[in-house]
C-alpha cells in the first residue's frame, strides 16, 4: 500500500487518497489491521474498512488518517463529509451511520442498472448450471437457524445439517460418481452467508447462502473437494470445534456423518468425550489409523489443513489422497461432474430440488426432518468431577 501511495503521489494529480480495505478492525488495536495500515501509511486520508462487519459509530483516527466502517450486508449507509485543511490534508466535519430501511425511496436509475445486471446473472452465470435466479427449488415450512446462530450459539443447528447433508447427496448422486461413499461432510460456519426463510426457496437464495469464492475454473463459487482423513484426525476435527471455535467462531463445524459430544467445562483440547460415525442407521466406531472420505468446500479444506500451524502443532490435520499421500495442492482434489466443478452452492440446490413433493403442487418440500436436530453435536454441560476427567482424549 505504501508503494502504491508513493506512486500515486509521484504520477497523479490527486487531492485525496482513499483505501478500500478488506482487512478490518478489532477491539485489540495491536491486531486491528486497518488501524495498523493507517499508522504504517500515514499519507492515506481515508480507509473504508470491511471484512470484520464492524459498525463504527465514530471514526477511528490515527494522525491525519480516518478509518470508517458501516457494518454488514448493506444494513447501513455510511455518510461523511471532509474539508481540506491549509496543509492539504483533510478534516472530517460530519459522520453518520444511516440505517437502510423501507422508509428510504429507491433511486430509479440505480435500480434500473441493478435490474440489468441481474438479467446477466441468468444468461452469463446460472445458465451453465441449468438454473434461473427466480427458479423455486423447494417450499419451506421449517424455522432454520440464522447464519449468526451458527457462529454465536455453540451447538448443532439445522442449517448446518441441511448444508452438510447436501454435500453428501450431491457427490453420491453426481453423474460420474466414483462409487466411493462419503463418510463425512463438513461445513464451517465461516463459509455460510445466509439462511433459508419460510416460503419458496429460490436459486438466488441458495446461491446467497453460500456465495463465497471462486474455483480453479475461474467460475464464481467454491467447488467441493474430496479428501481423506484418519479416524484420529476426525476426532481432532471434533476437538477443533469444541476447543478452538470459541476463539475463532468461523471454525465452528457442522457435519454430516460425524457425531460427537463435548463438555465446555473440561480442559481445552480435551473437551470431546465421545465421537463416532453415523451412517443414518447405526453408530460406527472410528478406527484411528483408517482413512475416511471427507467432503468439504475448497476454502474449508485449505483452512482445516492450516490447523497444525494455528495450534502450534497441538492439533494436526493432514488431508490426504485415497492412498494416504498428503495433498499439496487442493485444486487436485476438486470434485467434477462431466469435467465441470461441482460447486458447493449447486450441491445445496440439487439437494433442495431432490426433496419429495409432499403437497402435490409439483415443487419439492423441505422435509420435517430438518425441523429439529439429530444428536450430531451434543453439549454435555456437566460439572461433575467424574464427567470432567472421563475419557481423556
Q: What residue spans do the PLM features occupy?
A:
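Acidic, metal/ion-coordinating pockets
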Residues: 1-102, 245
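Catalytic centers of hydrolytic enzymes
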Residues: 71-393
Amino acid at each position: 500500500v505504501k508503494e502504491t501511495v508513493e506512486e500515486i503521489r509521484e504520477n497523479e494529480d490527486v487531492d485525496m487518497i482513499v483505501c478500500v480495505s478488506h482487512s478490518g478492525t478489532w477491539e485489540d488495536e495491536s491486531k486491528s489491521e486497518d488501524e495498523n495500515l493507517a499508522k504504517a501509511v500515514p499519507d492515506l486520508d481515508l480507509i473504508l474498512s470491511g471484512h470484520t462487519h464492524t459498525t463504527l459509530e465514530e471514526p477511528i483516527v490515527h494522525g491525519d488518517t480516518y478509518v470508517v466502517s458501516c457494518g454488514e450486508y448493506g444494513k447501513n449507509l455510511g455518510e461523511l463529509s471532509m474539508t481540506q485543511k491549509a496543509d492539504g490534508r483533510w478534516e472530517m466535519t460530519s459522520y453518520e451511520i444511516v440505517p437502510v430501511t423501507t422508509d428510504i425511496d429507491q433511486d430509479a436509475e440505480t435500480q434500473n442498472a441493478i435490474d440489468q445486471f441481474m438479467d446477466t446473472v441468468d444468461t452469463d452465470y446460472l445458465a451453465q448450471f441449468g438454473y434461473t435466479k427466480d427458479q423455486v427449488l423447494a417450499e419451506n415450512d421449517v424455522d432454520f437457524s440464522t447464519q449468526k446462530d451458527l457462529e454465536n450459539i455453540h451447538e448443532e443447528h439445522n442449517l448446518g445439517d441441511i448444508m452438510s447433508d447436501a454435500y453428501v447427496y450431491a457427490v453420491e448422486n453426481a453423474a460420474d460418481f466414483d462409487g466411493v461413499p462419503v463418510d463425512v461432510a463438513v461445513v464451517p460456519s465461516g463459509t455460510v452467508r445466509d439462511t433459508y426463510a419460510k416460503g419458496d426457496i429460490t436459486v438466488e437464495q441458495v446461491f446467497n447462502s453460500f456465495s463465497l469464492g471462486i474455483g480453479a475454473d475461474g467460475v464464481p463459487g467454491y467447488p467441493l473437494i474430496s479428501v481423506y482423513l484418519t479416524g484420529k484426525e476426525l476426532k481432532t476435527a471434533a476437538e477443533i470445534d469444541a476447543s478452538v471455535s470459541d476463539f475463532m467462531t468461523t471454525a465452528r463445524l457442522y457435519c454430516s456423518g460425524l457425531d460427537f459430544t463435548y463438555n465446555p467445562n473440561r480442559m481445552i483440547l480435551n473437551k470431546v468425550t465421545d465421537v463416532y460415525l453415523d451412517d443414518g442407521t447405526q453408530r460406527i466406531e472410528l478406527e484411528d489409523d483408517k482413512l475416511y472420505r471427507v467432503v468439504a468446500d475448497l476454502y474449508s479444506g485449505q483452512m482445516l489443513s492450516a490447523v497444525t500451524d494455528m495450534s502450534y502443532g497441538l492439533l494436526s490435520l493432514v488431508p490426504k489422497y485415497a492412498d494416504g499421500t498428503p495433498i499439496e495442492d487442493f485444486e487436485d482434489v476438486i470434485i467434477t461432474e462431466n469435467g465441470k466443478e461441482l460447486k458447493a452452492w449447486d450441491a445445496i440446490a440439487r439437494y433442495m430440488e431432490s426433496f419429495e413433493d409432499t403437497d402435490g403442487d409439483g415443487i419439492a418440500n423441505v422435509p420435517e426432518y430438518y425441523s429439529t436436530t439429530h444428536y450430531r453435536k451434543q453439549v454435555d454441560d456437566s460439572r461433575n468431577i467424574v464427567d470432567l476427567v472421563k475419557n481423556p482424549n
